[in-house]
Amino acid sequence: MSELKAPSLQSLLESERGSTDSLLAESLQLDFEDLDDAEFAIPPTDVLPTLEAVLSEFEADSDVASEFGMPVPHATPTPSIGEDSTIRTDGRGGGGSIMRYTLLHGISAQLSSAAERVNAGAASSCAVAAFIAIGTSHGHILNFDVTQTLRWAHQDKHGQGAVASLAFNADSTRLLAGFSRGLVAMLDTHTGDVLRELFDVITPNTGVLHVKWTSRSSLALCADAGGSVWSLSFTRKLGIRGCQSRCLFSGARGEVCAVEPLIMDSQGRHELDQYCIVALATLSKYFIVTVRPRLRVIKYHVLQGPPDCLPLLAWHLVLIQAADTSRSVDPVIVVGRGNQLFFHQLFVSNGRITLLYLRHVQLQGSLLSAHWLGPKCVASLDTAEILHLVDVRSSKELECMDMANAGLVYGSAQFKGLATGGNVSPAFALAGSNACYNSVVSRGTQLYVLGARSLHIIGVRTWSERISFLVKHHRWQEACQLALDGYIASVDRPRKRAQAKERIIMLFKEYIANSARAPEYCLGAIVNCLITVGELDLLWTQLWEKLHNSSTELFLQHISEHIEKETIHSVNPVISQALVDYWLEHSPAKLEQLILKLDWMCLDLNQVLKAVKKHRLFRAQIYLNTQALNDYTAALTELLPLVTPDETDLGNCLLVYVSSCLAGREYPSGEIPVELVHQVKHDVLRCLTSQHSKENAGDELPYPYLRALLKFDTRETLNVISLAFQEREFSNELGISHRKRIINLLLEIMSPENATWAEIGCLLNFIAQQISMQCLPRDRQLLERVLSHLAQEEIANESSRQHSERENAWHELLSSNCLAEISSDEEQLRLAEKAKCYCVVEYLLEKLERYDTILDSYIRNEARHETMFAYMERHVASPKRSIFRQLKRNLRELLTINAKETTRLLSLHYPEKINELLDNLRREENLLYLFLKCLNDRKSELEASQMELLLELYCKMESSSTVEEFLRSNSGYRLENAIAIAESHHLNRSVIYLYEKQESYAKAFELSMELLKSAAGEEAAKEAQTISALLARSVETLPAQELERCWFALLQYILPHQELQSITKSLLHEASQHIDLHNLVQLIMNTHNVSTSFGDIKDLLMGMLDSSRHKTEALRASAGALCQDLHLKFVKRYQHAHRGLWVTTTKCSMCRQRLYDHSQVLIFGGCGHGIHEQCMEESETQFEECPRCFTAIPDQSIGLPRPNKNLISISSSLEMGALQLKAPPRRFI
């Protein structure tokens, strides 16, 4: 068994180069030449698979993963990554189907072995390209190939600490490694040989944070813990490898935390390929720079965020569609910090590199990393170690996965500089406390998460893989919906659409194979998929056969839903028979709806026709007769005899059918074929106007079919005929003769013996409209017959609608001048007035220009009262309309109809006529009250006499409370007259209010006492409280003696009454503020029915004392607060008075001489300018603003008294030219 053991990691480290073969193959010592490639299915060695292709085979939900010992996740997957750890997924949008989790067991096992056997330490950083390189905390580097085979291992011999950062170049031939104590090493990825060891390419005594290759094969970037960024140019001259280091960004100007070069695989097809572009981010901003051909800053932005969060940068090429529908593939950078993600597009415009802001996404928690997983998604890991997958276009979170148990490696030690003595700034150390730049990396659509002894992959499944995942977990509903979404999204791409259709068919076959036990499960989604992709044959054959004995009813229900939605128009004949049988049993009405939307050719006509006749499905019967039998008259001859006033559905259905046929439209929808239109119209019209039916009973009246329709609904039948008359067939001479014939038939059918006057009226109105529209010739006899009907004075049971139709028909005949030959306008006017057709009257008056009586026609017509005021408003400015004369003549009627609108019209256009109109209404108090009330409501200025008249009318017609409310809300009356009016109507409360308004509180009190004496019970208590409030309001007006007398009078009445004891205490408390306490107690003691013991008045006296104490304390507190406020103000002003003034100039603003200390100086305030007091006196002008800068001067001018000591010596002032003040300067604002 010892021969089967793999060589140890120590042996690899001691060898000159790493292993180039598989460890397992080396241990077995197999002879590869003896193996047959075909027999063992060995792939060709010259074409190696990509890393993504190989790693995608090890997905957690595949059988291969299960063989490796990883359990397949179910609805809530928890795949094993170790002995005690799990990964939890939360499918918020994708239901756990979008992200695929994989644990690389081979690499994880090698990491554990290295840590235990050779003391390599925990993993510290990783890099992924064609190989997977992992650095450890003790300076070891392990390189794996795509099969997770360890190719070689490298151990640092110089004690440079942990491997802080790793980076592969573009062709994966070189590996850069940065160490925590400053060493940068370059290794050959195939052999593991060290090609370069660079000890002095960064800031001394600092560690490496990042090493990154740029788009140039010989140029790399390195960022150190001091915040500086260095460019490393690799050279090879005469076989000697060298490196030139250059500082691009110094940490003294800002500490760079993140570096991300732009690397595009466009092979020179993009305009940006000629530039070497790098994104840098500090703790306060991020910026885009070009390193080649010359160093230049393209753009920078401020970047804010929490102090313990690092900035994040990631590039990706994205297809961008502009607003003008143009498309371009440009690099897009995502910049993140805190919970914010910003997206910017980098492109070349007019030869200049431009950075364009695209969108902003805000997440829930603070971010640790952000990486592109394809051009549409960004994976972000937050501080709770939850991985969020965000759709860039919709800014929505698709799915999330809990990575807390993956054991994520943090690089906080490098940011804190622990390996170099901690010589980093506190802000840098705080920000790097959760750094994971080099332990979470991405490549393509896969994210690599490095644990201490494990490596995890989170990939984004493709559309097809997601469907397979959902199918495997029997989530058919989601799988079908996802498949349909992909099919619909590929509408503009035929190849993609064909692939999507093929995948849906495959999904259907998987459903058939897995639904043996419960075939009805998710049946609706499968049916929807097949109908959407047009695979109806599978629906009618395989699926129907699968469900034939178990779930046919559910299948038929789903098919019916799609027929109603008109997504399918034809079904298999076998299924159509089953469909008819099913719905005949459950809902014949539903069957009728389905028949109308199905192609008749898929139906069993014998079965369906029998069913529709048996169950009276008239619409379906008409549809089948016209479509299947091509007979457009059979429905009329069979169904019209069945029409009765109670058969509303059948009657309406036939009316719609006849209207459609005469208009050339199919029933219930569509168009009749062009070649059949004329024949169909002719056949239907001939059938309707046939003199006898097929049965031809002996007592049958002529024209039974048309008669049946007219009997069912005369008005709608005539509307159908009116629409038919508009068709082209009735516009020529033959069509006009057909019109005459139909009109004669209608007149013959609608005789007084066989029709009501309402029905005959509808017919005559119809004829009048046809004549007015020039659809019928002007036949004098016909016109006279029509006019005799229109001019009838009374028609029994005529509704308002019928009367309106009669008016409209008459009006149309007049406007088209059809009645000029048989009657004059004057005669028409008399007939219209007798028939009460006031619209016709108005038209004739307008025509005869007799405008002064038009308003009368509006007043008589109740239906036109609302439009009457619009008519007056429209013509109020026209003198010939005589609007005011008509208003004055009909004022009483107008006020009765709408007093508010009448008043508005008069006050707006005729304010000077108001008094005249009021005089005309003096004898009609009701109308006068309405008019005055509306004027007052419109806030019109009424005279005092008019207000008093309105008050008089209020007193007569409204309640006392309404009168009092009117008095309170208006003030245009005279108080003496108002009091007299109110007293004459015995409205005592209104009188009391007027006395109070007049400040005659004594009279108001006496009258209130009379009301109190006449009241009893609760009403008396309310009245007493009202009087108390009255006396409280009279304090400032009544003399003290009069006020005390009133209170004594009130209390003398209240105290003896036992029913008022409930308010006695409150009244005594209120009275104690206005009556001497000794007199009040004496009054209580002397009052009849009140005990003189101390116990009875104890509560009163204690209440008085408590009130007095509270008021005393309140007064003391108020006085203290006032004194304190005054003291604070005094202190503030005292402090201001002891502060010096800030003077900005040493020259007088008037005389421009120096401000010497021997003269008085005035300072203007906040501007700091000053003048001599003598200059101000000489100018004899009161300055309101500074003469120098025109700043407003405060009301209280500030003056500087002459000081006792010289503030400026003459010599120093002449030399320095400035004032020197001892007090600190201040500004006045």
Swiss-Prot record:
Q: Where the protein is mainly located, per its record?
A: other
UniProt-listed GO biological process terms: endocytosis; endosomal transport; endosomal vesicle fusion; endosome organization; protein targeting to vacuole
In its UniProt record, a GO molecular function of this protein is: GTPase binding
Q: Where are the zinc fingers (RING-type)?
A: 1148-1189
Q: Which organism is it from?
A: Drosophila melanogaster (Fruit fly)
Spans annotated as Disordered = 67-89
One Gene Ontology CC term in the entry = early endosome
PROSITE patterns per UniProt:
CHCR, ZF_RING_2
Q: Keywords for this entry?
A: Endosome, Metal-binding, Protein transport, Transport, Zinc, Zinc-finger
- Asked if the keyword Membrane belongs to this entry, the reply reads no
Q: What does this protein do?
A: Part of the class C core vacuole/endosome tethering (CORVET) complex involved in endo-lysosomal vesicle trafficking and lysosome biogenesis by facilitating docking and fusion of endosomal vesicles. The CORVET complex acts upstream of the homotypic fusion and vacuole protein sorting (HOPS) tethering complex but is not involved in autophagic flux. The CORVET complex may cooperate with the early endosomal tether Rbsn-5 to mediate endosomal fusion. As part of the CORVET complex recruited to endosomes by activated GTP-bound Rab5.
Q: What happens when the gene is disrupted?
A: Semilethal: animals can complete metamorphosis, but most of them die as pharate adults unable to emerge from the pupal case; surviving flies are weak, fail to unfold their wings properly and die within 24 hr. The eye color is similar to wild type flies. In larvae, results in the development of hemocyte-derived melanotic tumors in body cavities, accumulation of crystal cells and lamellocytes and disorganization of the sessile hemocyte compartment which might be connected to the abnormal increase of circulating hemocytes.
The family this protein is said to belong to: Belongs to the VPS8 family.
Q: Which InterPro entries match?
A: Clathrin_H-chain/VPS_repeat, Quinoprotein_ADH-like_sf, Vps41/Vps8, Vps8_central_dom, WD40/YVTN_repeat-like_dom_sf, Znf_RING, Znf_RING/FYVE/PHD
List the subcellular locations: Early endosome
CHCR repeat spans: 901-1063
Q: What is this protein called?
A: Vacuolar protein sorting-associated protein 8 homolog
Subunit-structure text? Component of the class C core vacuole/endosome tethering (CORVET) complex composed of at least Vps8, dor/Vps18, car/Vps33A and Vps16A; unlike in other species, Vps11 is not part of the Drosophila complex. Due to the reduced number of components the Drosophila CORVET complex is often referred to as the miniCORVET complex. Has a higher affinity than the homotypic fusion and vacuole protein sorting (HOPS) tethering complex-specific component lt/Vps41 for Vps16A, car/Vps33A and dor/Vps18, the core components shared by both tethering complexes.
